[in-house]
Amino acid sequence: MVFRLSRLVALFLGLTAAAHAHALKLSVTEATYNRETGRLELAVRLFADDLEEALTKDSGRRVPIDKPELLAPAASAYLRKHLTVKSAGGEVQSLSWSGAEVTATHVWLYAEVPLPGGLIGATFSVTFMHELFSDQLNSLQLRDGDFKQNLIFVDGTGEVTVRPKR
C-alpha cells in the first residue's frame, strides 16, 4: 500500500511539473516601421511564468507580473537590456516604454524606438530568456509596408543586420 501511494504521489508531482513547464522556449517580437513617425513599434510576447522568473532573477527580488507598479519598471529595464536596435549608421537607439498587457499565459511588452532611415541596414540583437534557457528561440518579425523579414536569435547569435531581399 505504501509503495502504491508513493507511486501515485510521484506520478502526481511529475504531472504537475509537466503541466507547469512548457516545452517551447519562444518569444515573438512584432516590429512594424511607421514611416510617418520614423519609429519602430515593438510588441514583444513572452511566456508569463518565464518573464516573472527572468525579472525576479534580473532584479534580485520577486517581481509579480500581476502588479503593474512593479512590472513596468522591471520589464522596461529588461526590454532595454535584452533587445538592442542600431540604426544603419551604427548608433544604438533608445527604447521608449509604452506599456504591458498580461494574459493568463503570456505578457505583451510594448515599446517604440526611433529608427532614422528605416529597417534596411539596421542591426538587432535579441537575447530574451537566454539567462534562463540555453535552448531559447527569439523571433523578430520585421515589417515596413510590403517588406517583411523574420530574424531568429538563439543563444550566441549576436547581432543581425537587416539586408534588402534579392
PLM features: residue spans?
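Bacterial N-terminal signal peptides that target proteins for export
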Residues: 1-12
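Absolute protein N-terminus
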Residues: 1, 21-22
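Hydrophobic h-region of N-terminal signal peptides that target proteins for export
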Residues: 12-21
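N-terminal soluble domains immediately following signal/targeting peptides that reside
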Residues: 22-166
